[in-house]
């Protein structure tokens, strides 16, 4: 037994004060997030008479769609494109996005509390 292992019975953690700065960090992360929600394509989108948001997919929406779809593929969701030896879920998700076959609806919230639903196939994707 070494000199450093004398009194480690797990009670030492009770003496540590909680850091109050963590709450500020969590709030800052929440404020920085874009007002976007990812919906499964089974849910019917809201019928929009006139859309006011941009028809371009933002880099944040692209990242979230690719991450969500890659997670679904990793959990054995059916793949919507033909595979040519790809095994990486992220590469498969990128291939699906390029083919506009991702079954996800993006919900964009507006400042007045309303929202617009956009299918991935409706958005203009810049590479």
Curated annotation (Swiss-Prot):
Record GO biological process: transcription by RNA polymerase I; transcription by RNA polymerase II; transcription by RNA polymerase III; tRNA transcription by RNA polymerase III
Modified residues (Phosphoserine): 2
GO molecular function, one term: DNA-directed RNA polymerase activity
Domain of life: Eukaryota
Alphabetical list of Pfam families matching this protein: RNA_pol_Rpb6
Record GO cellular component, one term: RNA polymerase II, core complex
Keyword field contains Phosphoprotein: yes
Stretch list, region Disordered: 1-53
Keywords from the named record: Acetylation, DNA-directed RNA polymerase, Nucleus, Phosphoprotein, Transcription
Subcellular location: Nucleus; Nucleus, Nucleolus
N-acetylserine PTM sites in chain numbering: 2
Bias kind Acidic residues: ranges: 1-34
InterPro entries registered for this protein in UniProt: DNA-dir_RNA_polK_14-18kDa_CS (IPR020708), Pol_omega/Rpo6/RPB6 (IPR006110), RPB6 (IPR028363), RPB6/omega-like_sf (IPR036161), Rpo6/Rpb6 (IPR006111)
Keyword Transcription regulation: no
Family: Belongs to the archaeal Rpo6/eukaryotic RPB6 RNA polymerase subunit family.
Quaternary data: Component of the RNA polymerase I (Pol I), RNA polymerase II (Pol II) and RNA polymerase III (Pol III) complexes consisting of at least 13, 12 and 17 subunits, respectively. Pol I complex consists of a ten-subunit catalytic core composed of POLR1A/RPA1, POLR1B/RPA2, POLR1C/RPAC1, POLR1D/RPAC2, POLR1H/RPA12, POLR2E/RPABC1, POLR2F/RPABC2, POLR2H/RPABC3, POLR2K/RPABC4 and POLR2L/RPABC5; a mobile stalk subunit POLR1F/RPA43 protruding from the core and additional subunits homologous to general transcription factors POLR1E/RPA49 and POLR1G/RPA34.
Main function: DNA-dependent RNA polymerase catalyzes the transcription of DNA into RNA using the four ribonucleoside triphosphates as substrates. Common component of RNA polymerases I, II, and III which synthesize ribosomal RNA precursors, mRNA precursors and many functional non-coding RNAs, and small RNAs, such as 5S rRNA and tRNAs, respectively. Pol II is the central component of the basal RNA polymerase II transcription machinery. Pols are composed of mobile elements that move relative to each other.
Protein's recorded name: DNA-directed RNA polymerases I, II, and III subunit RPABC2
Organism: Rattus norvegicus (Rat)
Record gene name: Polr2f
């Amino acid at each position: 037994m070494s000199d450093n292992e004398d009194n480690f019975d797990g009670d030492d953690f009770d003496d540590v004060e909680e850091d109050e700065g963590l709450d500020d960090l969590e709030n800052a992360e929440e404020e920085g997030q874009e007002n976007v929600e990812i919906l499964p394509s089974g849910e019917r989108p809201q019928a929009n008479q006139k859309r006011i948001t941009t028809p371009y997919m933002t880099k944040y929406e692209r990242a979230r769609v690719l991450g969500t779809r890659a997670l679904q593929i990793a959990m054995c969701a059916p793949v919507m494109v033909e595979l040519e030896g790809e095994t990486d879920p992220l590469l498969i998700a990128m291939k699906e996005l390029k083919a506009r076959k991702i079954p996800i609806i993006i919900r964009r919230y507006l400042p007045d509390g309303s929202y617009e639903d956009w299918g991935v196939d409706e958005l203009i994707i810049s590479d």
